[in-house]
């Protein structure tokens, strides 16, 4: 899904997220659905002792499509210690979300990766699974 709106330049915690072409929308789902998002990507740390967070920038929206809340949904951090510099690792972290309200069903979710040191990312694919 591609949407060219202010959401694609969303910011949270003082960090501006760019290169945001595409997001997930849940408007064909139902309150009570359980969603799993798996991101497959290769990551090459440029320095040892690098911590990487993978998740979604989640923006709930009201019935008029106004963003009501924006926050990050993250999973366990990935850590690359000594001896990992310059090596490429396949990652498949999973982030989950429970659609608890109509605002969640009308939400947009933008995949995001943040690292505390420079890394190379090669995106591969995503898998979005809905449990009812």
Q: How would you name each of these model-derived features?
A:
Residues 1-132:
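Extracellular jelly-roll beta-sandwich "head" domains, especially the C-terminal globular C1q domain
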